Regions:
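Catalytic/RNA-binding core of pseudouridine synthases
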Residues: 1-244
Length: 244
């Protein structure tokens, strides 16, 4: 008989190549018992980093509170190349011979200020008539122009609490960004390049923090193999996290 699982939050360092839902499925196969489980914010399959998993009714009821917390990312973009997904897994749509300098990238970052209007990518989880945009894009049920019009209608103001360049090695640049809920880093990477006179595709994306939860606290998914592993790493529900 499997031991009971503790309830609370499990901080996972998601590896590349698996969906956020795939992480939930992996944990369900370990649990083998009926318990409410969910995650607080999707990461793209190619992305790595912080995925907060809620276990139990008390924790899952707080998912919506975690999802609106600010998030921190480290991302690397490649200038001069733009794909339909805005990441390296997509099909190249256009290229540019112009590669901005490090100083031009830095100037572009400053130009954003503390907020800007962002158009979500075509490949995103935002829904249109009940279907996520990424599903509509993959099905080919709508033209690219129609999808772009839909994405444009979902434009929103996003907050940029902190934005800095960490490294530059042409044509690649790496940034750290602390942003509001709903900010698409793939779009931000391309928008940075556009303001510097080029275009860019995201090659590396890692979420390093969600609100007060830091990646240093997280556990690699592959190191969790038993319920005991889960119980040893569960963070009890602490309402102080949500009252600050």
């Amino acid at each position: 008989m499997n031991p009971p699982v503790k309830t609370g939050f499990l901080l996972i360092n998601k590896p590349a190549g698996i969906t956020s839902y795939g992480c939930i499925g992996y944990l369900k196969r370990i649990l083998k018992q009926k318990i409410k489980i969910g995650h607080a914010g999707t990461l793209d399959p190619f992305a790595t980093g912080m995925l907060i998993v809620a276990l139990g009714r008390e924790a899952t009821r707080l998912i919506s509170h975690i999802m609106v917390m600010e998030k921190t990312y480290v991302a690397t973009g490649k200038c001069g190349e733009l794909t339909d997904t805005l990441d390296y897994t997509g099909t190249v749509l256009t290229t540019s011979d112009y590669i901005p300098s490090q100083e031009e990238i830095r100037t572009s970052l400053v130009s954003f200020g503390s907020s800007y209007e962002q158009i979500p990518p075509l490949y995103s989880a935002l829904k249109h008539q009940g279907s996520p945009l990424y599903a509509l894009a993959r099905q080919g049920a709508m033209s690219v122009e129609d999808l772009q019009e839909i994405a444009g209608s979902k434009q929103r103001i996003v907050q940029l609490y902190h934005l800095q360049i960490l490294s530059y090695e042409s044509p690649f640049f790496t940034i750290q960004a602390r942003v509001s809920h709903g900010t698409y880093i793939r779009t931000l990477i391309n928008d940075i390049a556009i303001r510097a006179g080029s275009c860019a595709t995201t090659y590396v994306l890692a979420r390093t923090a969600i609100g007060p939860f830091d990646l240093a606290q997280a556990t690699d998914l592959g190191s969790i193999n038993t319920i005991e592993d889960i119980n040893q790493r569960i963070l009890a529900v602490d309402l102080n996290f949500f009252n600050e």
